[in-house]
Amino acid sequence: MLELNGKYNTAKVFTDNIDNETISQVIELLNQDYIKDAKIRIMPDCHAGTGCVIGTTMTISDKVCPNLVGVDIGCGMLAVRIAEKDVDLPKLDDVINTYVPAGFNVNDEPLGNFSHLNDLVAPANISLAYCSIGSLGGGNHFIELDKDDDGNLWLVIHTGSRHLGLEVAKHYQELAYKQLKDLDVCDKIKAVIADLKAKGREKEIEKTINALKMHEPHIPKSLCYVSGQAFKDYIHDMEIVQKHAELNRKYIADTIIEKMGWHICEEFQTIHNYIDTKNLILRKGSVSARDGEKLIIPINMRDGSLICVGKGNPDWNYSAPHGAGRILSRSEAKDAVGIDEFRESMKGIYSSSVMESTIDESPMVYKPMEEIMENIKDTVDIVKVIKPVYNFKAH
């Protein structure tokens, strides 16, 4: 465990395996005055992200930086245990390729009569959002069939809110930037006017004001925050988009289960890019781990996932890591991992997705499962390790 100190706050990092870029991103966050009262905890799977660290948890009150949640609002996992013990894997692969749009693809028509986006405040392409329900997306999103030690099969789906999350996040981050820029300029203009009047230089006021309007806010654009009504609107939209992401995972699962003729025994969802609006805890690449709460932590496409139960540890912000965490960026992975090594690592797992285009998601680009298991003992109990028998990623 490490402690990192910034100008306004301190963060606990629950791992020693952290690179300099990630440390720099954490410290930059700690140097922002608006998070001086936040409780910040960084998860063991942490790594540098676009504008913020993946694996961040922090308490919030009346201000929040939308970038800290990011663009895939509500992204998470759905785990479904099915009654069947023997599955036709080629048929499953065909069903997924036929009925679950992946990559940038969406459904031609909505799969249901949806209305949950009617009250969304942020502008968004609602028609596209509804057609996206039941679609996987790309990147590290996946569909997997895993087996536990008792021979039970688990359908595991990892995806989020698709393009809708991007639209909402972008809207509020731009709004945050504009609000802070306007606030900064307003404060400076008041001070300059008073100063110039006191010095009898009123003729310089207009020119000085015009120059000030070109200034950037004192906070980096990627870390600008919303407050006031914009904060309330963001939290409101956050809840709606999180529901949208949950629906997306559920529709994918229901489609597969119906086409395969399976039967559901149990299911649960674990979200990892969101704000817990009840307890005001922001989680970016981390999950809720309250006392007795069931959760799933995916490791990689070879080693499967951990099914855990939370311990409700307040020092961890009642949180756990959302995965193993990358040790190679996508570009580094394509240079460091060969296709033969990738194929060898996936022996025994049925997948039509092991190819050059998915090397950046190969098992070798993530931290070892053993490291994550060791580091999470204080926040969860591991109940099961479920191992892949089938894996699908967009390709």
Positions of the model-derived regions?
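Short beta-strand-to-turn element immediately C-terminal to the catalytic PLP-Schiff-base lysine
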Residues: 57-59, 79-82, 308-309
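A generic, well-ordered mixed alpha/beta core segment in the N-terminal half of proteins
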Residues: 66-116
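Domain-length cofactor-binding catalytic modules of enzymes
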Residues: 2-28, 35-42, 48-54, 62-66, ...
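Acidic active-site catalytic centers that drive phospho-/nucleotidyl reactions
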Residues: 44-45, 72
